[in-house]
């Protein structure tokens, strides 16, 4: 073969454990005319793929996790973006809420998406900036709990580089930077629910993963005081909170998700191309169409349920919350885009039983199969704590006198109760224990496709 002509095609190669790898194939042509024909045809085909981003805004948290965010982006992500002819504008954040403030000020219409390099905290900051900017531009008051929020046309890409990468792990199946970069390049799109958390008609925060009161709230509140410990603070605070074994009294009111398919205990996880999320999307579009043309204006009667008592933990998850330590997550069958949240109530129990409950999260066991655990799929919920001051003073006095004796005589069943806990909202502490939560169906989109079921593997890489 004289004067062969060659061109190289860059592609995605599937590896183990939901990881993707960059690969390339070189083609040789015997004739120059055929060579140019192939190049022209491939370029024309790529131009038709309008879902692929061409210009991205990238936020890098240089301090997240082990402080490797900038290095991870430069070594693993930037070269792939260059190969894909994606141009970027990079902002290295210098303070808390830098990314959020930037999204309120920048001209974001010129970008095809927003990329955040960091952990769940960095993603949350970008989420709040993008959702808040979209509502401001649309004239929607975020402080109104009944407001219908407007979804943003921009997608968010997550390059995992934090201490926790729960959102990335639950939407891609791994916390691997190269895999996430390739999902961005091919233009994947995944719609995801967002919960709005209010107190007294004031928006506190948005949540996409975990809202936790009691156990998880105490952990995050205690760990904030020990940032000098680094990542070890989470393990230390977790152990301390477990042995403290505090219970909190309150009332949970919730609106069951009547029209969603499935239940939290059906053992059917959310996967790529999920039919449950697809059906929810169709229902959402139908509701929007009816609202636009004022069809069937009668409002659905809301039948709220109420649960009272002493709780070790109250958790609400919009996704499985899977992570390397808990591969199945807090609620294995939670769906990313069905317009609902799985509300998990862990009532007062012994330390041993609570330990059994926690251990179930690390294996294939059903963590809801306990008499002290209740789980519901809900669209909205409210919580009001019962402060100690509301109790009868004589009962409270007698309790204080006998507290030490009871704890020493029954150490396994002791449930010392403080006045109130804090809410852990995607890793941030909320100021008020009394909250009102509403799930907004598929409010944001990610550069992801969901966890693929038994992906084909081309190698062991």
Locations of the language-model features?
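Residues that form ligand- and interface-recognition hot spots within folded domains
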Residues: 11-13, 29-33, 42, 46, ...
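Catalytic core of DAGKc-family lipid kinases
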Residues: 71, 93-95, 101, 108-111, ...
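ATP/nucleoside-binding phosphotransfer catalytic cores, i.e., glycine-rich phosphate-binding loops
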Residues: 1-30, 34-36, 306, 327-461
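ATP/NTP phosphate-donor binding region
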Residues: 1-117, 124, 128-146, 453, ...
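Short amphipathic alpha-helical molecular recognition features
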Residues: 19, 23-34, 48-51, 65-69, ...
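Core residues of folded domains in eukaryotic genome-function proteins
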Residues: 3-7, 21-23, 52-58, 84-87, ...
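Eukaryotic short linear interaction motifs
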Residues: 16-18, 35, 65-68, 89-90, ...
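Eukaryotic intrinsically disordered and solvent-exposed regulatory patches
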Residues: 41-46, 100-103, 141-145, 180-181, ...
